[in-house]
Amino acid sequence: MDIENLNQIPIVVEQSARGERAYDIYSRLLKERIIFLVGPIEDYMANVVVAQLLFLESENPDQDIHLYINSPGGLVSAGLAIYDTMQFIKPDVSTLCIGQAASMGALLLTAGAKDKRFALPNVRCMIHQPLGGFSGQASDIDIHAQEILKVREKLNQIFKLHTSQTIKTIQKDTDRDNFMSANEATKYGLIDKVLAKR
C-alpha cells in the first residue's frame, strides 16, 4: 500500500455511547480479525502483515485470524517471513483468496490452517518455481544459481506439507507457470473449499 493510495482508502465511522470514532476500512476490519494481503509481496507489506498477526495473537490467542489474499506474488524472503509467522503463532490462520493468489501468494494461501483454506469461485491461483536474474562474475552467478535451487527445494517442501502432493508431482507442476481455477486448486490441495456464499 503506497502513500498515493492513502487518499483512496474509505473511512468508516463507528458510533458508541462515548461518541464517534473514524477508522480507515482496513483498521476497522482488523478489529474483526481480518487482515488484507493485497498486491505484490515485498518487505514493507510483510512487516505490516507480520505485525498484524502478532498483534491479533496478543489480543486473543484462541480466536482464528482471517487472511484475505489477492496477490501476484513477490519476494520469497518477504513471503517466508509471513509464512513462518503464520505457523509460529497460536491462533489458526484461515486463508481466503479473493481475485488471485500467484507464486508466493499461492504458497501463503495453502499455508492456512487445515480445513480453513478457501477461495471465491472466480479466483485464479498460480504456482511456479522461484525466479531470479543475476549478472556478474561466473562464480557469483553459480552461487546465486545454487541458492535458487535450495529455495526451490524449500518451497516445494512447503507445498508438499500443505497439499499432500508428492515432491515429484510438485517439481513437475512448478517447472513452468501452472494456473488453476478455484475448483482445480481444491483438487490439487491448495485450498479446502470454494465459497460461493457466506
UniProtKB/Swiss-Prot annotation:
Its EC number is 3.4.21.92. Belongs to the peptidase S14 family. It holds the Pfam family CLP_protease. This is ATP-dependent Clp protease proteolytic subunit. GO terms for molecular function: ATP-dependent peptidase activity; ATPase binding; serine-type endopeptidase activity. Fourteen ClpP subunits assemble into 2 heptameric rings which stack back to back to give a disk-like structure with a central cavity, resembling the structure of eukaryotic proteasomes. It comes from Ruthia magnifica subsp. Calyptogena magnifica. Cleaves peptides in various proteins in a process that requires ATP hydrolysis. Has a chymotrypsin-like activity. Plays a major role in the degradation of misfolded proteins. It is an enzyme of class 3 (hydrolase). InterPro entries: ClpP, ClpP/crotonase-like_dom_sf, ClpP/TepA, ClpP_Ser_AS.
